[in-house]
Amino acid sequence: MKIDAIEAVIVDVPTKRPIQMSITTVHQQSYVIVRVYSEGLVGVGEGGSVGGPVWSAECAETIKIIVERYLAPHLLGTDAFNVSGALQTMARAVTGNASAKAAVEMALLDLKARALGVSIAELLGGPLRSAIPIAWTLASGDTKRDLDSAVEMIERRRHNRFKVKLGFRSPQDDLIHMEALSNSLGSKAYLRVDVNQAWDEQVASVYIPELEALGVELIEQPVGRENTQALRRLSDNNRVAIMADESLSTLASAFDLARDRSVDVFSLKLCNMGGVSATQKIAAVAEASGIASYGGTMLDSTIGTSVALQLYSTVPSLPFGCELIGPFVLADTLSHEPLEIRDYELQVPTGVGHGMTLDEDKVRQYARVS
């Protein structure tokens, strides 16, 4: 089977509510939906970045241009089943641009799996689990609203793990916020925080022990992405797990973090790491180094989330579960099939490919008019 055509379209999907981070506030998510065609079959992938280029070096506009102008011409007419060959071709054609490459690889894997009548997880060796515990992000910026949200999620048996966004208030106000959540939720919930690089090492060294005393189990990216030595010292000096997110994007960065034992947990993100194959390799580095893997998100839609679930279902150990909440914070969906949360766990889609069918009407509705 040869690749006949590759298409990329930008869609802008609003969120149900603003998502407040230390670096930006997200009101909508922009995705690039990539379709790869071969002999009447189509595979679908997705690229994107949280809040645009403020989080990473890519945005929807660059992803679309890279896919259409710089990747597609090199892939047309090549073997649609040879995903490894396509990855090498893309690496030679374009430096960086991880999300653009990830979107194409997702589409190729979806196409291949559908042609063979299997899931992407089966292409990757087979799933080890059918569901993954999922954390909900508390990011309204308001303590009462966050607490009400957490209580509702627990009562509905959707979430009992909560990641709280910190860093857009003062550290002292963050601590007061966490004290209120911890005291109110008690043993009914597992709490973790994401600082999104907002602290320096001195501030982190003061407030991480305070958070640990409140029962926080995981601290995500407390300092700047380049300051990996600070991450190492914070990991050495605290019992609570420290997780790399922004500091981790390539196989080389994974090796450096593992060699220096800078963190306890790797946050896996397909679009940030360049796709399924690259993320698999980073998960293998974590496993070999005794570092835990975590199923991260780029606020992906049902398409990207389903591909992530296919991969995460094959990772040997995910002690902290995942946070694939993208489809549940969006005001609408891009697929006909919904994703299901049951008893605090996100169910891995069944069926062929990534398990989702693109809703073409929704794509047309949210497609950006250039």
UniProtKB/Swiss-Prot annotation:
Keyword Flavoprotein present in the record's keywords: the answer is: no
PANTHER family per record: O-SUCCINYLBENZOATE SYNTHASE, O-SUCCINYLBENZOATE SYNTHASE-RELATED
Arranged from A to Z, the UniProt key words for this protein are:
Aromatic hydrocarbons catabolism, Isomerase, Manganese, Metal-binding, Plasmid
Source gene? Answer: tfdDI
Which PROSITE patterns does the entry mention?
Answer: MR_MLE_1 (PS00908), MR_MLE_2 (PS00909)
The record's CDD domains line, in alphabetical order, gives:
MLE
Give one Pfam family, short name only. MR_MLE_N
Protein name, please?
Answer: Chloromuconate cycloisomerase
Identify the pathway. Answer: Aromatic compound metabolism; 3-chlorocatechol degradation
- The scientific name of the source species is Cupriavidus pinatubonensis (strain JMP 134 / LMG 1197)
Keyword presence, Signal: no
Please tell me where Mn(2+) binds in this chain.
D194, E220, D245
What is a GO molecular function of this protein?
manganese ion binding
